[in-house]
């Protein structure tokens, strides 16, 4: 799962680091990335 650090804005994956901390700056607030999927909904 991909996250973005709120301080340094770098991409972080928690699987490779193993904790809830940015490996670049040490900040503990990570924002979850949204998926790039676009959903179509029919409204009738």
Swiss-Prot record:
Task: One GO cellular component term, please give it.
Answer: cytoplasm
From the Swiss-Prot or TrEMBL record, state where the protein is found. Answer: Cytoplasm
Q: What processes in GO biological process is this protein linked to?
A: DNA-templated transcription
Question: Which cofactor is essential here?
Answer: Zn(2+)
Originating species? Halorubrum lacusprofundi (strain ATCC 49239 / DSM 5036 / JCM 8891 / ACAM 34)
Major place of residence: cytoplasm
Question: Keyword Ribonucleoprotein on this protein?
Answer: no
Where along the chain is Zn(2+) bound?
8, 22, 25
How does this chain assemble? Part of the RNA polymerase complex.
Q: What is its EC number?
A: 2.7.7.6
Q: What does the function comment of this entry state?
A: DNA-dependent RNA polymerase (RNAP) catalyzes the transcription of DNA into RNA using the four ribonucleoside triphosphates as substrates.
| An example Gene Ontology molecular-function term | DNA binding
The reaction(s) annotated as catalysed by this protein in its Swiss-Prot or TrEMBL entry are:
RNA(n) + a ribonucleoside 5'-triphosphate = RNA(n+1) + diphosphate
Source domain of life: Archaea
Family, similarity comment? Belongs to the archaeal Rpo12/eukaryotic RPC10 RNA polymerase subunit family.
Q: How is the cofactor bound?
A: Binds 1 zinc ion.
Q: What is the lineage of its organism?
A: Archaea, Methanobacteriati, Methanobacteriota, Stenosarchaea group, Halobacteria
What are the UniProt keywords, alphabetically?
Cytoplasm, DNA-directed RNA polymerase, Metal-binding, Nucleotidyltransferase, Transcription, Transferase, Zinc
Q: What is this protein called?
A: DNA-directed RNA polymerase subunit Rpo12
């Amino acid at each position: 799962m991909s996250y973005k650090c709120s301080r340094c804005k770098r991409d972080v994956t928690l699987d490779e680091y193993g904790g809830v901390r940015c490996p670049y700056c040490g900040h503990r607030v990570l924002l979850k990335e949204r998926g790039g999927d676009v959903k179509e909904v029919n409204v009738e």
